[in-house]
């Protein structure tokens, strides 16, 4: 019997020299079949001041995007407050707890990973990644961050290409957004 689990994505966020960039690949796989190559998993929120990306179930992620956007509006664009409140609601709401997705959100000052278990994680070094190829992208980004003069955008581009060459659930159709 074929496996129908949907697997997808690598999302990488890098903050460097006052700039933040977030990138995501476009592949969506079901079992061992590529279903889509050009999915857009990166969004701008709050008049372009907040970047977000998701890994996991697309339907679940869009639900979380909507909830997060409401929190951002409710808390006047405060990224940290919105992230904490979304995680709290996600963890305690019976229906939301069943959603299978992870979010990375970032603005000009902060970046967070938000999970359904109530985790809100801010990276120590300005680099954070999620998804099936997240560990590959994270390793590449940390090496480039520490040992090159590349910009945040260039680090995301290079690291996502590396992840796409290693992870079978990640492709090289990259969507990239940045805040300068």
Curated annotation (Swiss-Prot):
Its main location: cytoplasm. GO terms for cellular component: HslUV protease complex; proteasome core complex. CDD domains: protease_HslV. GO terms for molecular function: metal ion binding; threonine-type endopeptidase activity. Its EC number is 3.4.25.2. It catalyses: ATP-dependent cleavage of peptide bonds with broad specificity. GO terms for biological process: proteolysis involved in protein catabolic process. Keywords: Allosteric enzyme, Cytoplasm, Hydrolase, Metal-binding, Protease, Sodium, Stress response, Threonine protease. It is found in: Cytoplasm. Na(+) binds at residues 164, 167, 170. InterPro entries: ATP-dep_Prtase_HsIV_su, Ntn_hydrolases_N, Proteasome_sua/b, Proteasome_suB-type. Allosterically activated by HslU binding. The active site is at residue 9. NCBIfam families: ATP_dep_HslV, PRK05456.1. A double ring-shaped homohexamer of HslV is capped on each side by a ring-shaped HslU homohexamer. The assembly of the HslU/HslV complex is dependent on binding of ATP. Protease subunit of a proteasome-like degradation complex believed to be a general protein degrading machinery. Belongs to the peptidase T1B family. HslV subfamily. PANTHER family: ATP-DEPENDENT PROTEASE SUBUNIT HSLV, METALLOPROTEASE TLDD. This is ATP-dependent protease subunit HslV. It comes from Leptospira borgpetersenii. The lineage of its organism: Bacteria, Pseudomonadati, Spirochaetota, Spirochaetia, Leptospirales.
